[in-house]
Amino acid sequence: MSISVIDERSALDDLLSSCYGAIYAYGVIAAYLSDPDEALNAMASFRIKRDQLLTSFEELGYPAPPASAAYSLGTPVVDEPSARVAAAILEEAGVAHWANALFYLPSQIKQRECEFLQACAVRSFSWSGIAKAFSFAD
């Protein structure tokens, strides 16, 4: 789900929603991989990010939106190659969501969120083998 980002609150809502969706998606993706560790590590990264964002919601006095019961993966996942494609697309979407939100985020979390954007770009490259914007980041 994509939220129209127009201010600080909507930026945070969009990022949290992206985390919820990614956590769900990586559970499905991991089930189709012969070695699910990479997907489970990515899921753990999104869980940590979700928790950081929930703390930011609390500190800023905003109510955090709840997670949905299920999410669309955006592409069918039926085997290992399609799971890897879904993971790459998921991380590319993460780059887009974080890039869109950065302008509106509070200054105290911008650096942290920029680093997460870069981590999404690196994971996208890891899944697809195709370099995208920001793939130079460690």
Where are the language model's segments positioned?
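All-alpha RGS (Regulator of G-protein Signaling) helical domain and cognate RGS-like helical scaffolds
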Residues: 1-138
